[in-house]
């Protein structure tokens, strides 16, 4: 145990006494297995606890919960090869005697299981003192010669159940293969069986150390937790999408049908995957889903101290092993990595505990436990869980012939870097906690202090979050998509400056994406360079890829089929609207005028059924000539009556990208499920049309829709504004503008992950933008700067205008043919280069006996298997400077110690202040000492901790500090109370891991304090923009369905509710993986 850690009495982690007894499963109707009654004698013997320095025999630390955990190990773990299991034996002399005791106890437990639960427990309790005395008096036999009692235990079959009856819960309940347990036993030799039982000692020793931690958990929770943590068969990360066939998934995470009764939480029931026939007929998909859900809840409910101390215990064990492997470079690097993991975990635990202690003060209400502090703690716990799983895998397989040293070292280094940066973010959050007023999430202080805080924050290293650790905090089903997006992004960025368009860029990116797919470190460094240095025009071009005709057509083929999907062009003509206070009076609604003068507004009408008015001549005259007219593809159907409802939708895209076409797939589903026509506004985009052009167009289209709702197939009785991200911002501002004009306000608003604060203010959730692959901080700042009217570079090419359309086609064709040749050659050369390096390293002579594995030999080599010319050994600074050129063999190697990476000085970043003030601010900053910088990072960090700094100079990352960002029609959160009181009922659907989460929480808090009807639902483990990913996985579909339910509350309020609809419900959604 680490010095300074507290020792807690045994009563803190003993299983709960109120457990139902386990009854044998009978043939016929399926029954739910439950836990066995605890033996009072066993509990009494385990109540006493000695100091950690007194090493007791291993069996004296065993509990019934661990017997269950050990007895529920997968059969696949018992089928390991003899050589692999031999290496799993511990190196310490004391625990080598415990396998004998363990085998005898397991043999007696199997015999007792045939006599009944109560009798078996008594027999074990009576014989345990004698066994302990025998253990102390006589040394245990070596691993090669088992004692007679052990041989008898090995000769006993693993399962002696009657034919047709199910096995006892103490035996493995499921098999990972199609063969029966009897066949599996026949294929395993006696030597393998002996060594398999001996190999389980490592897991037993790990669980024994876990008992010394502060925990109070039931036996079933201990069993599920121990099986998840000790799953060393699969090398993939926790919850990875490739875990479908892993033993933890196929072997059953918990007993089928058992409710995990977490303290203070509602039970989570894992349904059985079979219907009374055979456990082998369950589908792997359902097992995979159950494993992910259970592992996710274990992460949520696992005690933070338990997780940290478990990780520290494993790290110390790995340090002791690799330190004894000689002076090899790889062994030293592995020892250094685990030392860093131990240091960062111990430093992070108290900081996370402090944040958790006050996080509830920033929630909307007790039923809605969501804010940036909680999200930051959850992200850190996810990183600790991944390191815990990876450390356990290394501890169990480090001497195996199949152990990939280089791969596991790279994984550990990446997650250690992520953990280090997360610790820095936690210290930032503590600084915000001290500075902000109680209950306020956004920093409120002097703008100079805010600038200094964000300038220091933006210089943190980010590449580690975009390589191997990409999206580790999100649901596993969405991580492959994020990897595809990141590879496409960095490949697209290489060809952005070449002024290519269309198919040429896509083809070039395809051929250059190979090296980024092979090398995650290079991909992360390039991702960081692009996000910090490329301007908003790049992001606009990249996000608009979904607007291509080919991609949009494919998306529409997979979406629901609707009768009406038309692109309309609203003429820029003023019209009158009646006032709500006095309908006899009217107000003139002028067409949009800002920046570019009067112009038409494009809207898309979507309706599942053809309704009255939608095929009128007046509406047909507004159809844009090149717009979709899906109505013409259908024979003229019978018209449906006008709907009572109308949905006005504003799409997202950061105010700079996308149109209604990108969001059409889920809008079609909305039209089908809600039975209401939808009108989606294609507002003008920044930077060509900054604020307030988009607001003017959206308000003009909203008023036009109210006045001409009959043409849209609606009576206009209920009108709902809906939008996501930037569209959510427009929902609030349009409603505020309607109230200011005195015209009809909508009946309700559904905003998904809206941006309500565009002012450059720090908040705990916005700290997550450091690692968010879809909404990095630099991208957020550039989008807001463009919408606020900041000057951007003009990338319009006069040569393209002179070429014309046919000239562009000919030029792109020539570039495409050239890229086919150069791209294929580059990709093949990079692949052959990496293969050649690997073959050269493998051909080096290994002066070791044949009994040693390749990994063992690599640990002892003076020059490890990762040569100094490998990309894995380059620092991220070297990778960024390397670019497309070749790196010489004398490139310095990657060292993940904080002392090596911290000296890199951050470059000055013009993040908040205008360009003319950046130089003076930088000079003043350099003159100040660390203690005089107020919110400076070095003053916020404890002594000895140094986060990693980015080597990329973010010279093009200004956030326009114009006073316009404080305009309530741009930042609704800053609106005065009188304006917020004019809003209709608001329904917000936010993401717990979204950098914009605090925007939603603070707006909901303000509306709640004003007595306004508001609901807040927070979905877990999903990124910003999940609506456009609705068809990707089950979690995104459930989140999209939640948005539909919120809209339905506006269109059809529940019976008994007033015109404001639902007023009090708020919470964190559990159907989408939320906290229960």
UniProtKB/Swiss-Prot annotation:
Disulfide bonds: none
GO CC terms of this entry: caveola; cytosol; lipid droplet; membrane
Residue spans of biased composition, Pro residues class: 140-149
Functional pathway: Glycerolipid metabolism; triacylglycerol degradation
Chain intervals for the UniProt region annotation (Disordered): 1-198, 229-250, 838-930, 1055-1076
Pfam family, one: HSL_N
Regulation of catalytic or functional activity: Retinyl ester hydrolase is inhibited by bis-p-nitrophenyl phosphate.
Active site per UniProt: 725, 994, 1024
Compartments it resides in: Cell membrane; Membrane, Caveola; Cytoplasm, Cytosol; Lipid droplet
Substitution effect: residue 146 to Q: In a breast cancer sample; somatic mutation
GO molecular function, one term: monoacylglycerol lipase activity
Polar residues bias (residue ranges): 1-12, 38-64, 94-116, 172-198, 882-908
Primary localization class, coarse: membrane
UniProt xrefs under InterPro entries: AB_hydrolase_3, AB_hydrolase_fold, HSL_N, Lipase_GDXG_HIS_AS, Lipase_GDXG_put_SER_AS
UniProt motif Involved in the stabilization of the negatively charged intermediate by the formation of the oxyanion hole: location: 651-653
Sites of Phosphoserine modification: 853, 855, 897, 929, 950-951
Catalytic activity: a diacylglycerol + H2O = a monoacylglycerol + a fatty acid + H(+); a triacylglycerol + H2O = a diacylglycerol + a fatty acid + H(+); a monoacylglycerol + H2O = glycerol + a fatty acid + H(+); Hydrolyzes glycerol monoesters of long-chain fatty acids
Free-text tissue specificity from the UniProt record: Testis.
UniProt KW Lipid metabolism keyword: yes
Single biological process term from Gene Ontology: protein phosphorylation
Keywords in alphabetical order: Cell membrane, Cholesterol metabolism, Cytoplasm, Diabetes mellitus, Hydrolase, Lipid degradation, Lipid droplet, Lipid metabolism, Membrane, Obesity, Phosphoprotein, Steroid metabolism, Sterol metabolism
Family, as annotated: Belongs to the 'GDXG' lipolytic enzyme family.
Annotated disorder: Lipodystrophy, familial partial, 6: A form of lipodystrophy characterized by abnormal subcutaneous fat distribution. Affected individuals have increased visceral fat, impaired lipolysis, dyslipidemia, hepatic steatosis, systemic insulin resistance, and diabetes. Some patients manifest muscular dystrophy.
Name of the protein in question: Hormone-sensitive lipase
Recorded name of the encoding gene: LIPE
């Amino acid at each position: 145990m680490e010095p300074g850690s507290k020792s807690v009495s045994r009563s803190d982690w003993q299983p709960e006494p109120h457990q139902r007894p386990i009854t044998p499963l009978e043939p016929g109707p399926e029954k739910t297995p439950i836990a066995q009654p605890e033996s009072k004698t066993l509990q009494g013997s385990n109540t006493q606890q000695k100091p950690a320095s007194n090493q007791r025999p291993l069996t004296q630390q065993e509990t019934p919960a661990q017997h269950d955990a050990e007895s529920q190990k997968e059969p696949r773990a018992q089928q390991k090869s003899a050589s692999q299991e031999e290496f799993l034996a511990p190196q310490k002399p004391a625990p080598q005697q415990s396998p004998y005791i363990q085998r005898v106890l397991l043999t007696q437990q199997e015999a007792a299981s045939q006599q009944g639960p109560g009798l078996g427990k008594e027999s074990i309790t009576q014989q345990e003192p004698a066994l302990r005395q025998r253990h102390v008096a006589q040394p245990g036999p070596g691993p090669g010669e088992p004692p007679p009692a052990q041989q008898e235990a090995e000769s006993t079959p693993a399962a002696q159940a009657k034919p047709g009856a199910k096995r006892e819960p103490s035996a493995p309940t499921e098999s990972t293969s199609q063969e029966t347990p009897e066949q599996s036993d026949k294929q395993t030799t006696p030597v393998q069986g002996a060594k398999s039982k001996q190999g389980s000692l490592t897991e037993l020793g790990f669980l024994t150390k876990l008992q010394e931690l502060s925990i109070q958990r039931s036996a079933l929770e201990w069993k599920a937790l121990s099986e998840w943590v000790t799953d060393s068969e699969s090398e993939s990360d926790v919850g990875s999408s490739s875990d479908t066939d892993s033993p933890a998934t196929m072997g059953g995470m918990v007993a089928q049908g058992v409710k995990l009764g977490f303290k203070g939480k509602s039970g989570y029931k894992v349904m059985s995957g079979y219907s009374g026939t055979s456990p082998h007929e369950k589908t792997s998909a359902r097992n995979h889903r159950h494993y992910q859900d259970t592992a996710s809840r274990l992460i949520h409910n696992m005690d933070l101290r338990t997780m940290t101390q478990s990780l520290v215990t494993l790290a110390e064990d790995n340090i002791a092993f690799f330190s004894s492997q000689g002076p090899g470079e790889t062994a030293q690097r592995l020892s250094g990595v685990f030392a860093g993991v131990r240091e960062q975990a111990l430093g992070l635990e108290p900081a996370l505990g402090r944040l958790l202690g006050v996080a509830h003060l920033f929630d909307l209400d007790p039923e809605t436990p969501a804010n940036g502090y909680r999200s930051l703690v959850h992200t850190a716990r996810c990183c600790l869980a991944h390191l815990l799983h990876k450390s356990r895998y290394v501890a169990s397989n480090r001497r195996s012939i199949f152990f990939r040293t280089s791969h596991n070292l790279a994984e550990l280094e990446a997650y250690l870097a992520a953990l280090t940066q997360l610790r820095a973010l936690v210290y930032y959050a503590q600084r915000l906690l001290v500075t902000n007023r109680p209950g306020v999430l956004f920093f409120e202080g002097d703008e100079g202090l805010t600038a200094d805080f964000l300038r220091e924050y933006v210089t943190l290293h980010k590449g580690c979050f975009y390589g191997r650790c990409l999206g580790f905090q999100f649901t596993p089903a969405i991580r492959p998509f994020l990897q595809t997006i990141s590879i496409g992004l960095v490949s697209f960025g290489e060809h952005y400056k070449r002024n290519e368009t269309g198919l040429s860029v896509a083809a070039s990116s395809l051929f250059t994406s190979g090296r980024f797919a092979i090398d995650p470190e290079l991909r992360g460094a390039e991702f960081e360079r692009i996000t910090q240095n490329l301007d908003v025009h790049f992001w606009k071009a990249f996000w608009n890829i979904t607007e291509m005709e080919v991609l949009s057509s494919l998306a529409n083929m997979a979406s629901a089929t609707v009768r009406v999907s038309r692109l309309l062009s609203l003429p820029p003509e003023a019209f009158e609207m009646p006032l709500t206070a006095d309908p006899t009076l009217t107000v003139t609604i002028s067409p949009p005028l800002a920046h570019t003068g009067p112009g038409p507004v494009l809207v898309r009408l979507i309706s599942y059924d053809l309704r009255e008015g939608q095929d009128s001549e007046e509406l047909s005259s507004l159809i844009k000539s090149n717009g979709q007219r899906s109505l013409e593809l259908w024979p003229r159907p019978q018209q449906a009556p006008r709907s009572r409802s109308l949905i006005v939708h504003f799409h997202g895209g950061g105010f700079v990208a996308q149109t209604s076409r990108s969001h059409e797939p889920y809008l079609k589903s909305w039209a089908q499920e809600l039975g209401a026509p939808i009108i989606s506004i294609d507002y003008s985009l920044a930077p060509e049309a900054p604020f307030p052009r988009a607001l003017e167009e959206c308000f003009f289209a909203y008023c036009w829709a109210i006045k001409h709702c009959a043409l849209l197939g609606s009576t206009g009785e209920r009108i709902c504004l809906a939008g996501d991200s930037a569209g959510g911002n427009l929902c609030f501002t349009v409603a505020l503008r309607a109230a200011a004009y005195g015209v009809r306000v909508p009946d309700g608003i559904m905003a998904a992950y809206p941006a309500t604060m565009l002012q450059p203010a720090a908040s705990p959730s916005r700290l997550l933008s450091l690692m968010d692959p879809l909404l990095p901080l630099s991208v957020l700042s550039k989008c807001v700067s463009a919408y606020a009217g900041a000057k951007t570079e003009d990338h319009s090419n006069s040569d393209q205008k002179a070429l014309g359309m046919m000239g562009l086609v000919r030029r792109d064709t020539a570039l495409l043919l050239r890229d086919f040749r150069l791209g294929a050659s580059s990709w093949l050369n990079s692949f052959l280069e990496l293969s050649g390096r690997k073959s050269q390293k493998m051909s080096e002579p290994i002066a070791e006996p044949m009994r040693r594995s390749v990994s063992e030999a690599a640990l002892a080599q003076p020059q490890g298997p990762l040569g100094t010319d490998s990309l894995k050994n380059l620092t991220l600074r070297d990778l960024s400077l390397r670019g497309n050129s070749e790196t010489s063999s004398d490139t310095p190697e990657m060292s993940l110690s904080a002392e090596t990476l911290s000296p890199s000085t951050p470059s000055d970043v013009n993040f908040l202040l205008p360009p003319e003030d950046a130089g003076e601010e930088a000079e003043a900053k350099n003159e100040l000492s660390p203690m005089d910088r107020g919110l400076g990072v070095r003053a916020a960090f404890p002594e000895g901790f140094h986060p990693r700094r980015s080597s990329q100079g973010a010279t093009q990352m200004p956030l326009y500090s114009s006073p316009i960002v404080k305009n309530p029609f741009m930042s609704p959160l800053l609106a005065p109370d009188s304006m917020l009181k004019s809003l209709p009922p608001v329904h917000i659907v936010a993401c717990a891991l979204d950098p914009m989460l605090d925007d939603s929480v603070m707006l909901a808090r303000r509306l709640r304090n004003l007595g306004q009807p508001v609901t807040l639902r927070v979905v877990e483990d999903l990124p910003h923009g999940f609506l456009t990913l609705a068809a990707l996985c089950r979690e995104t579909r459930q989140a999209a369905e939640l948005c539909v339910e919120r809209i339905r509350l506006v269109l059809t309020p529940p019976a008994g509710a007033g015109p404001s609809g639902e007023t009090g419900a708020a919470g964190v959604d559990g159907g989408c993986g939320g906290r229960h």
